[in-house]
UniProtKB/Swiss-Prot annotation:
UniProt source species: Escherichia coli (strain K12)
Membrane topology: Single-pass membrane protein
Subcellular location: Cell inner membrane
UniProt protein name: Heme exporter protein D
Family under the similarity heading: Belongs to the CcmD/CycX/HelD family.
BP GO annotations: cytochrome c biosynthetic process; cytochrome complex assembly; heme import across plasma membrane
Keywords: Cell inner membrane, Cell membrane, Cytochrome c-type biogenesis, Membrane, Transmembrane, Transmembrane helix, Transport
Amino acid sequence: MTPAFASWNEFFAMGGYAFFVWLAVVMTVIPLVVLVVHSVMQHRAILRGVAQQRAREARLRAAQQQEAA
């Protein structure tokens, strides 16, 4: 198997189309990174909301038991 490029400089130059190739790479990677960060933030927010709701329900149950006693 022969390499497509003879050197790293040739690889980064992409046969004279470096601007377009690397611009396409950047325009693909940035949205993917944003998507991952947003997904992680949403996941944490959902878990935090569930924990708050469970705590609220536990407080309500405790208050109801205290009133009944």
